[in-house]
C-alpha cells in the first residue's frame, strides 16, 4: 500500500512539473519566453559540420555588427558593444527573416546566419504586407521605404515614433500635405519639424534639429522622427501627397536575452 502511495505521489509531482514548465515557459499560443514557437529545432540547434557554411564562420560581436550593416540594416557603430542601436538591428533582421520582431540578442546559430547572409550577399524578400511607400515598425523603431511595386527596391532606416502618452496611430495612411522648410508645430510650441509630410491629421514624418533626437525608443509627440538625410532622400524622390505611410507593431521596452 505504501509503495502504491509513493508511485502516485511521483506521478502527481511529474505532472505538476510538466504543467509548470508549459505554463510559465510558453504562453497560450505556445510561444516561448524568447519568442520562439515551441521553439523550432532549426533555430536552437547548431548545425552539423559542415552545413551550408554556417559551422565555419567565426563569430565575434564586431563581425555580427558589420554583417548587419553590410545587409543594409542600421546597427550603430561596429565596436563590439551591443547597445540599443544594435538591438534595433536585430529587431529589423528578425522581421526581414520572418521571425517575431524583438530586440533580444540572437543565439549563436542566429549570429552565424546573420554573418552568412552578408557573405553570400543575399537580399531579403519582402512579403505582401509591405506597401509601396513607408513601412514604419513601432516594435523595432524602424522604417522600410519600399520604392517599387515588386518590393525589390527598398531602403531601411531608424525612426522614433510617439511616446506612450502621445502614440503614433497604427494604420495605413496617405500623405495629405507637406512643407518644404522648417515648420513649427501648432500644438507643440517650439516644436520644429524639418520638411514635414503630414499623413494622419497632425501626425507627420519629419526630421528634427539633431539626429540624436531620433531615439531608439518612442519619444515624439505623435509624429515619426526621421534622420535628416533620409528626409532629404524622400523629397529628392518626390515622395509626398498621395503616397502611403503604413504604421504597425507595438514597442516593448522589455528584453529577454538568451544565454549566449
Named regions from a protein language model:
Residues 1-13:
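N-terminal Sec-pathway targeting helices
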Residues 49-57, 74-80, 100, 129-132, ...:
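Second-shell loop/turn segments in exported
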Residues 23-32, 167-170, 182-260:
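Exported/periplasmic cell-wall-interacting domains
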Residues 52-61, 69-115:
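Short acidic, glycine/serine/threonine-rich helix-capping segments at coil-helix boundaries
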Residues 121-214, 259:
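Gly/Pro-biased beta-strand-loop elements
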Residues 13-78, 172:
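Acidic, Ser/Thr/Pro/Gly-enriched interdomain connector segments
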Residues 66-74, 91-99, 148-151, 180, ...:
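Sec-exported extracytoplasmic/periplasmic mature domains
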Residues 42-57, 98-133, 258-259:
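Intrinsically disordered, low-complexity Ser/Thr-rich linker and spacer segments
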Amino acid at each position: 500500500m505504501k509503495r502504491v502511495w509513493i508511485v502516485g505521489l511521483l506521478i502527481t509531482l511529474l505532472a505538476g512539473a510538466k504543467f509548470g514548465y508549459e505554463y510559465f515557459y510558453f504562453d497560450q499560443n505556445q510561444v516561448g519566453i524568447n519568442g520562439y514557437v515551441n521553439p523550432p529545432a532549426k533555430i536552437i540547434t547548431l548545425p552539423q559540420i559542415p552545413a551550408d557554411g554556417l559551422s565555419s564562420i567565426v563569430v565575434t560581436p564586431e563581425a555580427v555588427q558589420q554583417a548587419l550593416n553590410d545587409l543594409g540594416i542600421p546597427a550603430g557603430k561596429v565596436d563590439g558593444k551591443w547597445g540599443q542601436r544594435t538591438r534595433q538591428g536585430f529587431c529589423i533582421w528578425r522581421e526581414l527573416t520572418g521571425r517575431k520582431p524583438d530586440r533580444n540578442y540572437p543565439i549563436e546559430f542566429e549570429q552565424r546566419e546573420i554573418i552568412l547572409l552578408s557573405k553570400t550577399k543575399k537580399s531579403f524578400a519582402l512579403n505582401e504586407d509591405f506597401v509601396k511607400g513607408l513601412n514604419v515598425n513601432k516594435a523595432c523603431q524602424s522604417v522600410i521605404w519600399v520604392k517599387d511595386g515588386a518590393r525589390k527596391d527598398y531602403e531601411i532606416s531608424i525612426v522614433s515614433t510617439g511616446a506612450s502618452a502621445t502614440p503614433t496611430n497604427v494604420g495605413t495612411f496617405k500623405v495629405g500635405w507637406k512643407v518644404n522648410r522648417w515648420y513649427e508645430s501648432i500644438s507643440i510650441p517650439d516644436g520644429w519639424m524639418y520638411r514635414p509630410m503630414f499623413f494622419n491629421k497632425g501626425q507627420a514624418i519629419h526630421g528634427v534639429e539633431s539626429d540624436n533626437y531620433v531615439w531608439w525608443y518612442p519619444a515624439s509627440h505623435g509624429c515619426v522622427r526621421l534622420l535628416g538625410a533620409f528626409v532629404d532622400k524622400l523629397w529628392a524622390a518626390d515622395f509626398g501627397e498621395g503616397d502611403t505611410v503604413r504604421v504597425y507593431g507595438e514597442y516593448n521596452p522589455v528584453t529577454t536575452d538568451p544565454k549566449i
